[in-house]
Amino acid sequence: MTEYQPGLEGVPATRSNISYLDGKQGILTYRGYRIVDLAEHSTFEETAYLLLDGELPTVAQLERFDTQLREHRRVKYNIHDIMKSLPVTGHPMEMLQTAVASLGMFYPNHVPVQIRSPGDETEQYVYGQSIRILARMATLVAMWQQLRLGNYPMRQRRDLSYAANFLYMFNGEEPDPLVARIMDVCFILHAEHTINASTFAAMVTGSTLASPSYVIAAAIGTLAGPLHG
């Protein structure tokens, strides 16, 4: 007979094949690579590819991946209008959850009725949508900052890296290269933290074959909770 565990306390949800964390020893690895090495030698774009694909990219693969991220940074005016209608006093996480959930309405690009069963077509769809959401996430945050200040959001710059473009859109001016690199490292350090509450929420939502925008919106809502940590 299975013992009842309220709140799943002490019950392992799953084992991560993506990252390993040992807080006591100060160890964090992504796909077997030490975080200190990635922070020193990698970029956020390369690290994101590593997390999504499982292996570090070749030069050609990284160029193609980076191009995809740059191509999908822009968001439709419909998303801008939705964000503009939100109260500027609202919490940024509430805005982000709303905006990400709305992406699925304007950028469906989905496998017909929603993903009937797992398979190659589904994996390609999820991978493509993950890239699109990742590309637009920083844009949404930067747009919200400008809207809160009463400004019109800055246009994205495809000549800038992911981190540099975020800072440019967020602050309204091109960042110093050192500041952009610091932001890049911050993105690397926060890219993956094993099976926490928001990851678990994403796994539960994804297990129903919900679209990626729903999955990430659920994770954002969980991340916003004060007990998440």
Stretches found by the model and what they are:
Residues 1-227:
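Hydrophobic alpha-helical bundle cores within soluble ligand-binding/oligomerization subdomains
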